[in-house]
Amino acid sequence: MLTDSALLTLLQWVSPALPIGGFNYSEGLETLIAQGQITSAAALQDWLGFELAFGSAQWETAVMARVYRAIAKGDFEAVHQWNAWLSAARESAELRAQNWQMGTALINLVAALDRLPPALQTGQPYPWNVSVAFCIAANLADIPLETALLGYLHSWATTLINAAVKLIPLGQTAGQLLLRQLQPQIQQTVQQSLNVTDDNLESCTLGLALASMQHETLYCRLFRS
């Protein structure tokens, strides 16, 4: 059950105003827009919808479900293992740096506002991925797993849509309409992620990987990924 306190905390963690630097990143969108591959709200919806169904958003939420359950059981070794798995799964230096930077900022914020379990304060061989840090924050606030995943994907979509509003550009209303239209796919991705087995953790992110790698050499960049 989502209590009022947990709801307010979730709204804080998914707010675009959260000081973890999400506004600095486009996750390859800047490359695709510069190359003329995404030039409209419809094209952006197709791209984000694919990421939700088959791409990084799909497998990341499946891993987040495992992390959340491991924290709930006190299996902090599994938390570290899945964080390392996510770090290894990043397909470019920019995507890995993005997740580590945002994850470090978020875990520091969580430590300042809440009390981290001692087992999560030390022994981490890699910086925290932002999705793992989000799971830790959600678990400490007693936010239910499914609700936490919905909030995370809503925040992810909001960040990328806001980047596209600047880059394409799109109108603010068009951006909000797109966010509303993605709601069914966000819900479907969360439901699927709750039941994915370890053997079926997979994605098809060739376009994202190439766009992210090519972003490093763009002549002019507004975003860090």
From Swiss-Prot:
Keywords associated with the record: Chaperone, Cytoplasm, Nickel insertion
Molecular function in Gene Ontology: nickel cation binding
Location (main, coarse): cytoplasm
Cellular-component GO terms for this entry: cytoplasm
Location in or out of the cell: Cytoplasm
Record carries keyword Ribosomal protein: no
SUBUNIT field: UreD, UreF and UreG form a complex that acts as a GTP-hydrolysis-dependent molecular chaperone, activating the urease apoprotein by helping to assemble the nickel containing metallocenter of UreC. The UreE protein probably delivers the nickel.
Stated role: Required for maturation of urease via the functional incorporation of the urease nickel metallocenter.
Family affiliation: Belongs to the UreF family.
Protein name (Swiss-Prot/TrEMBL): Urease accessory protein UreF
Underlying gene: ureF
